[in-house]
Curated annotation (Swiss-Prot):
It comes from Neisseria meningitidis serogroup C (strain 053442). Disulfide bonds: none annotated. GO terms for cellular component: cytosol. HAMAP family: NadA_type1. InterPro entries: NadA, NadA_sf, Quinolinate_synth_A_type1. It comes from the Bacteria. This is Quinolinate synthase.
Amino acid sequence: MQTAARRSFDYDMPLIQTPTSACQIRQAWAKVADTPDRETADRLKDEIKALLKEKNAVLVAHYYVDPLIQDLALETGGCVGDSLEMARFGAEHEAGTLVVAGVRFMGESAKILCPEKTVLMPDLEAECSLDLGCPEEAFSAFCDQHPDRTVVVYANTSAAVKARADWVVTSSVALEIVSYLKSRGEKLIWGPDRHLGDYIRRETGADMLLWQGSCIVHNEFKGQELAALKAEHPDAVVLVHPESPQSVIELGDVVGSTSKLLKAAVSRPEKKFIVATDLGILHEMQKQAPDKEFIAAPTAGNGGSCKSCAFCPWMAMNSLGGIKYALTSGRNEILLDRKLGEAAKLPLQRMLDFAAGLKRGDVFNGMGPA
């Protein structure tokens, strides 16, 4: 078991209202390991490096996890990226074991794409509010009421929900895929993030029925307070993740996935940025652009309070101790039913093939050749 002290955070998930019925989501919680001191962290990193070699394993981490884990992944030849980059890296890497530092759906996606590999996670209880807010039974019932519609789901969903879908998308390729489907005259069901779905619907004009889920982090950003902060820093570029509410997105100079926001922060000439996404991304932004200033976008109104305060509590459950425990014990393994994995792989692989085509420039993205 992990020995680090753990702080517990409890969240009463809001009532998720679907277009057809209400679905009460169970109370969600996160138990976050305390940050180790420098000596302990260095010892754990050395032990993990040796274990990764011994187990023929590679560390695949999301931008939102502890900076110590992000740095360790890069130091050991692993990956730090958004969910699309993580999925692609894990599928292409030769390692027999993938240690996925992120939330549960990311580990499931890795197992779906690589059923022959062992997929471990630092903590199997690292959830996602979007996943929790889209129960498979309720979502399937909703889809069954609209059999003429193509089902497109965000990657932040369970394997069971992916298996019900025609397409899986990430924020990196969602606009392009929906534009492509619209060009084919297809009407869509979208789930689970209502803000991202609404943004894509406005940008593409696609006919989309939206599931009403949201990200506990991005849902808390406030448009009015962001406008006031922007007025205080008129020279700042506003970077916004599209899981944010419309009032926030409309203030963004750059709207896109974590990878797109990182690229903008590094490549743009401006020296000041307001960042409306999980603040875990600031570590890589500051590493790649040390001469620039990054300001956190507000997550609560005047006199208000925030639940996540721009840090995903489930991402924070990933720890060095958890990685060591998974590697030494072989526990915390992602296991999926074979038939479920095969069904979920079809829409997920469809996305990866489409994204690869975009990179080659030979896929129509709804707006002309990519």
